[in-house]
């Protein structure tokens, strides 16, 4: 659950939630779209996009233009 009163930025909180879902095997394959994440978690699309960008930069997911974001199965994360 995202908490706007925490000092941690919302995009980092969302990234942590998604990372946890991936680590627990709850999120595999395709990651929900930016729009879906924004609606589901009650944040702006820019916040959801920033969360996915952070996970991409960490190697947790890969983003393919025109196709979406996917859990990185290569083990590089």
Regions found by a protein language model. Name each.
Residues 1-43, 49-62, 73-77:
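Extreme N-terminal segment that seeds HTH/winged-HTH DNA-binding domains in transcriptional regulators
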Residues 67-73:
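Minor-groove-contacting beta-hairpin "wing" of winged helix-turn-helix DNA-binding domains
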């Amino acid at each position: 659950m995202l908490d706007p009163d925490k000092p941690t930025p919302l995009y980092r909180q969302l990234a942590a939630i998604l990372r946890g879902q991936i680590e627990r095997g709850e999120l595999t394959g395709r990651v929900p779209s930016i729009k879906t994440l924004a609606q589901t978690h009650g944040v702006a699309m820019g916040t959801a996009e920033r969360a996915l960008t952070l996970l991409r930069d960490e190697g947790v997911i890969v983003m393919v233009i025109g196709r979406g974001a996917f859990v990185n199965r290569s083990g590089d994360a």
